[in-house]
Amino acid sequence: MVFLPAIDVKTSEAVLKLSHEYPGYAYPMVGLHPEEVKADWKEQLKKIEAILDEHLTAVDGLNGIKYKSDYIAIGEIGLDFYWSREFEKEQLEAFEKQVEWSYETGLPLMIHCRKAQNEMLHILRKWKDKLPGGVFHCFTGNQQEAKELLEYDNFVLGIGGVSTSRAVICVKTFPQ
């Protein structure tokens, strides 16, 4: 299986097309990556939301309307203040809007976060018991930061190769 995160309008469409070429193998996500949040972010987000809506089907569930989507998650979204805080306010607004999509659709989140954990948690706390879950991908934090993130039900940490050696020390301290 290959999970295909999107970062903007173009890739949100491209990953869906690729998933149709490789059904059962490639699984698409839809979203606006924080590094792609620029001056035109509102227009980008509206287009991505339209793409998401186009590929949602409402179905009756036991507890009301549920949604089925051609996308498996909202992602890769988040906050990234590592290189610049120029579009900080815009990133915060874009992230919160996409978290709202997760709540509305039941799609999990693929979250990218660098140098912005406090800001990310401030937004997620509003939705803590309402979100379907997801992945805090490429986690590079410490034990305390991991503990804070793992308090969110149905969320997991993704630990990538860039941070593996430092993360091994942190992971050894996690509860079994």
Residue positions per predicted region:
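Mid-domain alpha/beta scaffold segments of enzyme catalytic cores
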Residues: 1-176
